[in-house]
Amino acid sequence: MSSKEDYIIKPESVSPSNDTSQWPLLLKNYDKLLVRSGHYTPIPAGSAPLNRDIKSYVSSGVINLDKPSNPSSHEVVAWIKRILRVEKTGHSGTLDPKVTGCLIVCIDRATRLVKSQQGAGKEYVCIVRLHEQLKDDKELNRALENLTGALFQRPPLISAVKRQLRVRTVYDSKLIEFDNKRGLGVFWASCEAGTYMRTLCVHLGMLLGVGGHMQELRRVRSGAMSESDNLVTLHDVLDAQYVYDNTRDESYLRKIIQPLESLLVGYKRVVVKDSAVNSVCYGAKLMIPGLLRYEEGIELYDEVVLMTTKGEAIAIGIAQMSTVDLQSCDHGIVAKVKRCIMERDTYPRRWGLGPIAQKKKQMKADGKLDKYGRVNENTPENWKKDYKDLDEQPAPPIPESKLVAPEPQLPKKKSLIEEVEVDIDVEDKSEKKEKKDKKEKKEKKDKKEKKEKKDKKEKKRKAEDDSSKSEKKKKSKKD
């Protein structure tokens, strides 16, 4: 027999918590986010990024592509557009034709994130060829250490941009291998977007006093994605589309394409109520009542990602409050939208559902208000009393100090010198105008003469051609 105590819920100081460390994408460590409110009404609209239907999964996806050597980045992106039969594709930063490695290809809706990825940091593995042997093998390592931090760079001779001097930052570099006899060195570098590795190799050669150039280059990281993050080849993309077209098997296509949320995992997160999602998609600012959870360490004007409770990215926003403010404030703007990602009306509209808004809607339908919600001849008197037309409101009263009329000011008499100067200016203007008119007339006359000469030449040439043709015909008849 079991005792009665077995069925009693005992009070505990520790509540069981979900392990969210294995949750995907933006939902990872969801339980560690700070809670603003736990009360909201879930809406069945939308879906988790990994559970989208295949059409919307592809149109809001990104591919971490291993770019092959020889074709340009634009060619590769155009090929993917043709293979997947999508409307738009974009990439995360150009790679030279001979360069290989990470090229993030954004599809359709994900192209809205291209700008943020182009400005993100990059990592490269580079082979440098030195023109002469070094006296000491350690010299190359020392030179690499010197070439870190902010550096002046001018684009190479053959480049797509204007060759202006610019400052680019190399954050870190590491020598992997060096063969002094062959003059070949392999090094890794982490740098700012827009750094020219070719120029860096030339500078290395100059610093060592032997000269050098870039032999080979591979990008191993671009923004949020590296070689280890599901890197795929063009053949994989082609095969995946072929398998889907012929067998309707989505698994291969889902494997090579990742949701756009995978690019945003580095941003601070702000979780939005389902009822506020569509208003943010229409460009509204996120206010405190629409906030559910937020991350630690948000500072004023930081870039944050606004997300739903299902883990979908709504928009990239600019924080208008820090984490400390979000904890203490009960009203105000949380974030302004910088770039909207989600399509409008994915979630239903939840504004205009209050009693006054509903009444106004009904009155518009009955013809008691015009289509803009303004008063007309059918509007009831009780509504007119409370209605305020902002266009017809009286202007604010003018302060008494400004009501005093200013003293009338008589026009100042000009001196004789000023009058003469004015006359000279008028004469100069009239002379300039006359000269301009004469010039225009002369140009028109010249054009007309040229045209006439041209026409005469054409007529003469045609007459000569006709006469030569007639002579040929006569000769042929005689023969």
Curated annotation (Swiss-Prot):
Keywords: DNA-binding, Isomerase, Microtubule, Nucleus, Repeat, Ribonucleoprotein, Ribosome biogenesis, RNA-binding, rRNA processing. It comes from the Eukaryota. Residues 435-460 have a biased composition (Basic residues). This is H/ACA ribonucleoprotein complex subunit CBF5. The active site is at D96 (nucleophile). Its main location: nucleus. It comes from Candida albicans (strain SC5314 / ATCC MYA-2876). Belongs to the pseudouridine synthase TruB family. InterPro entries: Dyskerin-like, PsdUridine_synth_cat_dom_sf, PsdUridine_synth_N, PUA, PUA-like_sf, PUA_sf, tRNA_PsdUridine_synth_B_fam, TruB_C. Its EC number is 5.4.99.-. Gene3D superfamilies: Pseudouridine synthase, PUA domain. Residues 358-479 are annotated as: Disordered. Pfam families: DKCLD, PUA, TruB_C_2, TruB_N. Residues 267-342 form the PUA domain. The lineage of its organism: Eukaryota, Fungi, Dikarya, Ascomycota, Saccharomycotina. Catalytic subunit of H/ACA small nucleolar ribonucleoprotein (H/ACA snoRNP) complex, which catalyzes pseudouridylation of rRNA. This involves the isomerization of uridine such that the ribose is subsequently attached to C5, instead of the normal N1. Pseudouridine ('psi') residues may serve to stabilize the conformation of rRNAs and play a central role in ribosomal RNA processing. The H/ACA snoRNP complex also mediates pseudouridylation of other types of RNAs. Catalyzes pseudouridylation at position 93 in U2 snRNA.
